[in-house]
Swiss-Prot record:
This is Pseudouridine-5'-phosphate glycosidase. Keywords: Glycosidase, Hydrolase, Lyase, Manganese, Metal-binding. Mn(2+) binds at residue 130. Catalyzes the reversible cleavage of pseudouridine 5'-phosphate (PsiMP) to ribose 5-phosphate and uracil. Functions biologically in the cleavage direction, as part of a pseudouridine degradation pathway. It comes from the Bacteria. The gene is psuG. PANTHER family: CARBOHYDRATE KINASE PFKB DOMAIN-CONTAINING PROTEIN, ZGC:136858. It catalyses: D-ribose 5-phosphate + uracil = psi-UMP + H2O. Substrate binds at residues 81, 101, 132-134. SUPFAM superfamilies: Indigoidine synthase A-like (SSF110581). Coiled coil: none annotated. Its cofactor is Mn(2+). Homotrimer.
Amino acid sequence: MFISEKVQKALEENKPIVALESTVIAHGLPYPENLKVAQEFEDIVYENGCVPATIGILKGKVIVGLSKEQLIELVDDNPIKVGTREISYAIAMKKSAATTVSSTAKIASLAGIKVFATGGIGGVHRGEWDVSQDIIELSKTNIIVVSAGCKSILDIKKTLEFLETFQVLTVGYKTEYFPIFYNRLSKEKIYKVENADEIANIFNEKNKLKLESAILVANPIPEDYVLDNNEIEGYIKTIEKEIAEKDIHGKEVTPYMLKRLVELSNGKTLESNIVLLKNNVELACKIAQSLKK
């Protein structure tokens, strides 16, 4: 594992660091918007007094703190999408890979980083028996993950049941209902926190008890970017039919759904996705700062 000079320096000087994933850049956003947004994420982290650590695998080397040039190279190298399970494969086969929530959380934790910002976690898909690695990884990795909950394409109730079963503490930032996007809030109740200091305190108490699971901080999408639920559900039904007809499954499902949602919504879901990501990065910075108090 290679830790960049800026991240290593921040670790040595005990500065707040926020980990960022590469899958949303390589597979979640279209080119060239993805590279522009990646830079904006890092700028937000710096502006909030923290150090960004974008994580990915470049030609078999795990990198914590990808440079702008390395990120461009990663995107251009047709990277595979890897969860924790596939990290060793990517390394051994000298593959370039974009890291998902599970693999980013694992690598960040191994590097000593305590806070990670993402868009949404993977969960339990509707219909077929498809459960994301993210939940399993969060059950055994000591990190705070800030997300906008999970995508409305998932089975929200079952996702929360899995999080509970695997002892992943899930808290809502200024809400007692689990967020989903692009609809803001579900009807499923969770614990509520009011500020970053409370989240940091919960994490510190958890560590005193040597509980190794993550804390999932669910941060609702800003209200101005919420999309109509009926509209989104209509798109999802159309896409689910396409997925069945084309026999798309496994890791290919989510990227396909996100791409088609952007197309069917005329770009509205893409705009919402970028806004919620930036919103999560800002909250992650506040939490990282609070952990240093």
